[in-house]
């Protein structure tokens, strides 16, 4: 008898809309391959009842808090249900951009220069301290919450007068923030399937930066796969992405985002343990370049579940 698979989608995070799209796409891909897959919106159905409902395996298509931060993974471990993607520790760590960066720095991987600020500090931040950050990092800057994905809560800061407002906007989403140097150069992403880096993708948003709308709704964002890198640079990027992915304990599948500066050097941004699987998403694009259809991709991800 075929395994009954739950495709977890929707949920309650800031990325609910995207998760619904990802989940429906995954569901269609699994069913195309003859898999007995069913949609489960965790907003309406208690995850603790999955086993009682006869499910034997879980495909996680949730994004953001409660879905890719280790919380859900811990529940599924307790229920002894195999699930896709990274485990508890890697999911929790990867969701936290600040602590992920600290791990990468600790093993000598390159990250974009940054300072971290928490909500207790911000009330005491003087204008002179803000000026110090700007002096250290230069303008423009990018301000982002540590614990949100899909560019939620991010703001580009072009003038020092905009910095305090950007911090306040980001604090609506998290108590820890990153203020990063703005890197002038292309953004790349590397999808990882098992222990293999798929062909890199170069991202060219029409807007100022690759924000939530550019990722999921814009028809003007351009993606290049192959990315146009030389064979040597492609290999260098693949090795960096794999090392970054494995160093925080990721497994199954994921995606590593990287910037290149004007000198051609790569800087790690973040790792995503439950990437989007919508029509605009990047992992399916990289998989196509590697010869995998969408249905073959989701079946492979499911096979890697443990």
Curated annotation (Swiss-Prot):
Annotated family: Belongs to the D-alanine--D-alanine ligase family.
Protein known as: D-alanine--D-alanine ligase
GO CC terms, sorted: cytosol
Function statement: Cell wall formation.
Binding sites annotated in the UniProt record for Mg(2+) 1: 257, 270
InterPro entries for the chain: ATP-grasp, ATP_grasp_subdomain_1, D-Ala_lig_Van_CS, D_ala_D_ala, Dala_Dala_lig_C, Dala_Dala_lig_N, PreATP-grasp_dom_sf
NCBIfam families the record matches: D_ala_D_alaTIGR (TIGR01205), PRK01372.1 (NF002378)
Organism: Photorhabdus laumondii subsp. laumondii (strain DSM 15139 / CIP 105565 / TT01) (Photorhabdus luminescens subsp. laumondii)
